[in-house]
Amino acid sequence: MVGGEDFTHGNTLIFDAERDAFLYTPKFLDAIVAVGRQSGALNWQAGGRFGSFTDEDGDTIDPDRAYDVDGPNRTWWSHAHMSHAWADGFVLYDNGTHHSPLVSRVAAYTWDVEAATLKRTFEFVNESGIYDPILGDVRKLDGGNYLVAWTMSGSMTEITPAGEVVWRMSVELGSGVGRTGYVPTLYQVTYQ
């Protein structure tokens, strides 16, 4: 596509029951958009060139600089995958395609959708400086830790809110871990 972006390449689609909307992250727009389930209308956009949200410093992304994704406090993201959102926040896997140096990270945010503001509350970069140009995923676990799939390295980690790695897994095949989820047990245990 000459002079344009593939806006239909969606990395994520999540249903937000509280707002009766779908949250969609189009890869090349570097944004999160909310689309009304009933109306199909664009409710709002966070991030990207034309996003209406501001960060904690009041910064937005200049529409004339499409890839000014970091902002003064590295608030923004690039080519992210967001699999987990809740009423006042979300966590995403920031592929980091427009960061310098190229490095992927986990970033969690609080947001106020009505005020159109967001604040980064957590950031973690893998100690080996992994850059995943594709895929990657993160979920916030019930206890507050984050479960991360570092796709290209074929590894997963569980990270505390303090940034401590408490669990790690690697697969011999390399880039074989895409989306992640937590399964508490593979067995249903019943006692008589």
Predicted features along the sequence, with ranges:
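Histidine-/acidic-rich catalytic cores in large beta-rich domains
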Residues: 1-192
